Amino acid sequence: VIVKLAENYSHIISSANTFGKNLMPRIAAALDTSQISDIIKVIAPDTFLRPIYAGNAFATVKSKDAKKCVTIRPTSFDPCESSGGSAPIEKADPGEEFAKTKFIKREEVKSDRPELGTARVVVSGGRGMQSGDNFKLITSLADKLNAAIGASRAAVDAGYISNDHQVGQ
């Protein structure tokens, strides 16, 4: 659906969160264009700044592609001032070729904890926790520190904790 809608746009942009990092490479491949990941600054419509080497250096990336597929680091831009209005909402018709799929629901995880991607403190566990019950130890520590809870991919894959807690790659 997004690839079809992208015909009318020069830039396809997503947050550099788990969803965006999963979706945008597929869109870029379908559009036969490069993806520019994790930008922190827009220099020009075709030029972007992004961190490299774990944030120890920066690369200026210039794209010659007609379509730009870009993910933006969520905390890299200051919030803009609200002008009191809102953008119009346009309904997108995916067309008959997508009629075989049906959106059922989206489940959002509600938590009183800080969001994992922006938390100041994260308490994390891995496969060494050996079970989901042992993650309660991390939960009590995170409560005292007002921290987010993280988990390694191995712990998530083992079913010790849900995948919305996964940190790293």
Where are these predicted regions, by residue range?
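N-terminal glycine-rich FAD/FM-binding segment characteristic of electron-transfer flavoproteins
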Residues: 1-169
